């Protein structure tokens, strides 16, 4: 009995020493830490918005952007904001998920789908809860419906394009990885900025969207890391019993 006990513990220790297990543990710990920070930051932002303390900041930033924006940016900003609409994101999501399944990246496909759908659902709920009206500081010739806080475009940008960037960065190596990361981050920021340029969101709306999506994304990643850990423990136990 003592021998069997020692063998089972040795098997678990070997599993814990495996690189994948350590990576999962690191991701889980990092996920919990980032989640805690994002929750705190989002709560602080909500408090500032609800109390009206962000009103002056929001107005100042929007008016500054409007007064310092050249007309030639209108076209690029409209294109950037179009990339955040569901009628563009959904087809791109379908293509990406199908492509990942075809190359055998099934878990990545699932994560991308859950990240995008969950972030979108979270945004809809938060918009309904806070019911913040959209800014009407200037007429940019562009209209948007529904509530303002948080920005759905910012959330979708991180939930879809951000998740896609993380997946590709994990799969790629060398310069290709950094190129994907730089382009992905630039696209997310560009979509968020386009909402300010067009005057349909306050800066705090966009910031809240950027925070809401990572909260869901990190939660999904932490859940995946925990699942890997549990699966590894079960596999180690199964190997022990099979002896």
Regions found by a protein language model. Give the residues of each.
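Hydrophobic alpha-helical transmembrane segments
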Residues: 26-30, 87-90, 109-114, 178-186, ...
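Alpha-helical membrane-inserting segments
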Residues: 38, 42, 46, 122, ...
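Residue-level signal for helical boundary/lining positions with a hydrophobic bias
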Residues: 80-81, 127, 149, 201
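Membrane-embedded catalytic cores of phosphoryl/pyrophosphoryl-handling enzymes
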Residues: 137-243
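C-terminal ends of transmembrane alpha-helices
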Residues: 43-44, 124-134, 190-201
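Membrane-interface loops
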Residues: 50, 56, 92-93, 97-179
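N-terminal transmembrane-helix/juxtamembrane module of multi-pass inner/ER membrane proteins
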Residues: 1-88, 128-142
């Amino acid at each position: 009995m003592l021998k069997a006990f020692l063998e089972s513990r040795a098997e678990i220790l070997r599993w814990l020493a495996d690189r994948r297990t350590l990576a999962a543990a690191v991701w889980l710990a990092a996920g919990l830490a980032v989640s805690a920070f994002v929750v705190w930051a989002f709560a602080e932002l909500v408090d500032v918005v609800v109390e009206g303390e962000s009103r002056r900041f929001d107005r100042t930033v929007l008016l500054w952007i409007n007064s310092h924006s050249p007309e030639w940016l209108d076209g690029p900003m409209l294109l950037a904001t179009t990339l955040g609409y569901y009628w563009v994101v959904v087809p791109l999501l379908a293509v990406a998920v199908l492509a990942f399944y075809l190359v055998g990246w099934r878990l990545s496909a699932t994560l991308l789908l859950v990240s995008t759908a969950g972030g979108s659902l979270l945004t809809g709920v938060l918009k309904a809860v806070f019911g913040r009206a959209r800014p009407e500081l200037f007429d940019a010739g562009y209209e948007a419906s529904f509530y303002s806080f948080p920005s759905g475009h910012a959330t979708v940008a991180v939930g879809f394009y951000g998740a896609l960037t993380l997946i590709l960065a994990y799969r790629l190596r060398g310069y290709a990885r950094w190129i994907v990361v730089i382009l992905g981050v630039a696209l997310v920021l560009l979509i968020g900025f386009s909402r300010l340029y067009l005057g349909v969101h306050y800066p705090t709306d966009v910031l809240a969207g950027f925070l809401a999506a990572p909260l869901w994304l990190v939660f999904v990643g932490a859940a995946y890391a925990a699942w890997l850990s549990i699966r590894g423990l079960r596999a180690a136990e199964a190997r022990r019993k099979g002896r």
